[in-house]
Design a protein with these regions (language model features):
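Alpha-helical transmembrane segments of multi-pass integral membrane proteins
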Residues: 98-156
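Cytoplasmic juxtamembrane regions at transmembrane-helix boundaries
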Residues: 71-94, 152-156
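Alpha-helical transmembrane segments and their helix-start/interface "positive-inside/aromatic belt" motifs
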Residues: 1-14, 81-88
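Hydrophobic alpha-helical transmembrane segments
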Residues: 57-73
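Interfacial loop at the N-terminal end of multi-pass membrane proteins
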Residues: 3, 14-61
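Transmembrane helix-loop junctions and nearby membrane-interface residues
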Residues: 21-28, 71-78, 102-109, 136-142
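Hydrophobic alpha-helical membrane-insertion segments
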Residues: 10-25, 89-98
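Extended, charge-rich alpha-helical interface modules
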Residues: 2-11, 24, 34, 45, ...
Length: 156
């Protein structure tokens, strides 16, 4: 299992996505007297003297679910057809998750607060984006292995 490069790619995607559950912020909307920080635990309002948490968006459930789905894909290495199908599903779900975060980055400031605000990217956003190529490369590696095994079966 560890000899295959897609195992390493899937493991790196799990690490990148799972590390966002440590509370790293994805992005922040900053105004003159207030800032809104968006992480996997929700949206936190940071005022000058106090902070309050809005847990209306539980992103951590989808992050943990996607990490578990990536792990299941990693562990189904004996059945390449199923692993390829699951890897494609993981890549699609990961792409949807990234696209939703990009849309919220551009439209979220207007939803949360009125007036002028500045956007700041956090380390969690970079890790979220960094895991997507690993997921895609794992899918390509699984496809290459399946093609190699199918050609060997054809020669028998």
């Amino acid at each position: 299992m560890i000899q295959r490069v897609q195992t390493i790619y899937l493991f790196l995607a799990i690490i990148c996505l799972g590390s966002t559950c440590l509370g790293l912020e994805f992005f922040r909307f900053v105004q003159s007297n207030e800032a809104f920080s968006f992480s996997v635990f929700g949206i936190e309002s940071l005022k000058e003297a106090s902070s309050s948490m809005f847990k209306s968006i539980p992103i951590y459930l989808s992050v943990i679910g996607l990490c578990l789905f990536l792990f299941m894909t990693l562990m189904s290495y004996k059945n390449l057809k199923r692993q390829l199908k699951w890897a494609r599903s993981c890549t699609f779900l990961y792409a949807v998750f990234v696209l939703v975060s990009i849309v919220f980055y551009y439209a979220g400031g207007g939803i949360i607060s009125e007036g002028q605000y500045a956007r700041e990217l956090g380390l969690g956003y970079a890790l979220l984006i960094a895991g997507f190529p690993f997921c895609f490369l794992a899918q390509l590696g699984i496809k290459k292995d399946k093609k190699l095994l199918d050609s060997l079966d054809r020669l028998r």
